Amino acid sequence: MAIEFAPDNIRVNAILPGAVDTPMLRAGLNRGHVGGETIYDRLENLARKTVNGRIGKPEEIAHAIYFLADDTQSSFMTGQALIVDGGATARLSTE
């Protein structure tokens, strides 16, 4: 798509968020509850998968979106997938 829309000066990028503390994440974690594990145990488990030991905040994803939307900061960026996952993907590559 980036190639297709470039002549019209339209940039195409994607945000790939990791675990972000939202009602949707918490609802998903509550589904299929097994054993004595609480939602807080599940949140903690997700946090341990990141290199900084926590899950993301919605505003952190919003900052990435603002960056991509701002032509003064990202006008030369197109065809990219911006991973915002607290380093979880980087950790996977070392395991």
Task: Specify the residue positions occupied by each region the protein language model found.
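Residues at or immediately flanking beta-strands
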Residues: 9-11, 78
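Short, flexible catalytic-loop segment of classical short-chain dehydrogenase/reductase
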Residues: 17-27, 31-32
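Short C-terminal tail/terminal secondary-structure segment
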Residues: 72-73, 78-95
